[in-house]
Curated annotation (Swiss-Prot):
Keyword Cell inner membrane found: no
Family: Belongs to the peptidase S24 family.
Superkingdom assignment: Bacteria
Residue numbers annotated as active site: 134, 171
Organism: Bordetella parapertussis (strain 12822 / ATCC BAA-587 / NCTC 13253)
Protein name: LexA repressor
GO BP: any one term: negative regulation of DNA-templated transcription
Enzyme class label: hydrolase
Reactions this protein catalyses: Hydrolysis of Ala-|-Gly bond in repressor LexA
Database matches in Gene3D superfamilies: Umud Fragment, subunit A, Winged helix-like DNA-binding domain superfamily/Winged helix DNA-binding domain
Residues at the site labelled Cleavage: 99-100
Assembly, per entry: Homodimer.
Amino acid sequence: MATKLTERQQEILDLIRQTVARTGFPPTRAEIAQALGFRSPNAAEDHLKALARKGAIELTAGASRGIRLKVPDNAAPSAQLTHPLLAQLVLPLVGRVAAGSPILASEHVEREVGVDPGLFTQTPDYLLKVRGMSMRDAGILEGDLLAVKRAAEARNGQIVVARLGDEVTVKRLQRQNGRIELLPENPDFSPIVVANTDDFALEGIAVGLIRTQPLH
């Protein structure tokens, strides 16, 4: 990052890093505004655009959590997967998972990739390549690698990898009044209501995200 940040911009960048470290995902504009005492999310948006111009982050238009911390300027977009100084943890990359309409997941490991363990809130067990845009507003986009920790249980509101029969999907878990729903983060998609008769299981929880392609 070649351009020096203002004190306020550094505060926002630190907040983004802390939120990603704690939750695995960046904060929303409203969360930034609340944490730093801005009057509205628009003030946070102005600072985020300045950070993007200075090369500290990348922004995804239309996504409430569409904030990406950038790798060093001299690194290629995929460097966080292959750079020898960062590749300290080797994870299997499992077949593509639909983050739109659920599709049959590939069970074989496509390859193994080395990643920086500091990218994640917990140590993941594998990476899943996302296809589709149903989790767009959580900042999870087509082609992203979702870091997943195997888990049979999850807290309400966590982003999970869930299996319905032989199909796998990435959604936000919601339990309410004894009912389980898998919620998208895109108004173009409908929630999935899990019936008592469905063959349902949690495959894991999301603990981080890696982008392998630059934002446009």
